[in-house]
Amino acid sequence: MLFGKNRSCFALKMYEKDLEVVDEYKYLGVTVVTGDSITFSTSRPLRHFRSAANTLLSAPVKSSETVTVKLLYTICIPNLTYACEALNYSSRQFHDLNVAINDCLRKVFNYNRWESVRFLRQELGYPSLTEIFRSRSRKFHDCMHLLQNDTLNLLNSLSFDEE
C-alpha cells in the first residue's frame, strides 16, 4: 500500500504485487491522512464519541446530572483522547472535538446552544479537553526517558525545545 500525495506514473510493486495508492490509512485506531504534512482525521473518534454519548443520553432511565457527566467523562471522552499524546490536530479539528463535548454537557443540563458550559464544567471539577491533552502529553514525554532509547530521547528533547 502506497501512502502519500504524489502519485507516480508507474506502478510500484512489492513481492511482485502492485502497491495500492490510498488517501487515508488506519493504523492502531488512528486515521492518518495524506497531505503535505502528516495529519490525522477526527471523523472516527467523533463518530465513536457521539455514538457512546447518544447511547448514554438517550437511556430510558435517567440518572442524576452528576452521574451522567461522570459517565460521559469515563465512557465517552476516552474516544476523543485515544492516542492524543502522539496526535497533532489542527485548531479546527480541536474546535470540533470541544463542540461535541460541550453539546453533550448542554444536553445533560438543558442549556441552550449559546450558553457557555465552561463555568459549569469547572465547578464540577472536570478538565477541559485542552487540559486533558496537555496533561497526557506531558506525562507521555516525562516517561519517555525511562525507555533508555537514545533516538526517542533525542526526539523528545527536540519536541520540547520548540515549545
Regions found by a protein language model. Give the residues of each.
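Acidic catalytic cores of enzymes that act on phosphate-bearing nucleotides/polynucleotides
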Residues: 110-163
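Short, flexible/disordered secondary-structure transition segments
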Residues: 82, 86-87, 94, 115, ...
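Short amphipathic alpha-helical coiled-coil/interface segments
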Residues: 76, 97-108, 137
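A glycine-rich phosphate-binding loop feature that marks nucleotide/adenosyl-phosphate handling sites
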Residues: 1-6, 93-97, 118-126
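Short, conserved micro-motifs composed of acidic
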Residues: 1-24
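Basic, alpha-helical interaction scaffolds
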Residues: 16-88
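Short helix/loop capping segments that flank catalytic or ligand/cofactor-binding pockets
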Residues: 11, 35-36, 141
